[in-house]
Amino acid sequence: MAPIIPNPKRIKSFPTEAAFETWLAANHARETELWLKVHKKDSGLRTVTCAQALDVALCWGWIDGIRKTFDARSFLQRYTPRRAKSVWSQINRDHVARLTAAGRMTSHGRRQVDAAKADGRWAAAYAPIRSATEAGIPRDLRAAIGASPRARKTFRGLGRMNLFALAYRTNAMKTAQGRARKIAALVAMLERGETIVPEKRR
């Protein structure tokens, strides 16, 4: 995959959360990308934080993406409109619940939530790595692993990083056919005794 290079014309900085929200309210429907320049804490410069910016993005149907270094005092965080069929995390589901209770979600943000609930992406939201467990593995993947003694043996030795990776890669598939192929590939990988992330020897 080709590296994503920030477009200088799409780099902006905002001193406050309110300033970023004003920009997104005016541009959420016509812009396709924003590289938010966030100043580091020790820079002494006033800046919206990534946590604040994510709240604003979720309210307007956008989502955060990759982060890139910029200079000694700041970094860039990419924000884009949430794409159809994009996966949700449990963390962002929790953020939406908080923002909804606070009355901050706009109709644009709620539309993304409603679409995710309608097609199952909301229920399939992935857990953070720190809470990844065998119970968090999608049922169809678990069933396929359970049907293979060799895959089951490898699966029993997986740590949180690999459990998270299995769940994420399965839930990231956009179609039933793609999901079935991904599950078959993951089971075959486990049958070979391989893992997505190298496991530490115990």
Model-derived regions: residue spans:
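Charge-dense, helix-prone N-terminal extensions
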Residues: 1-202
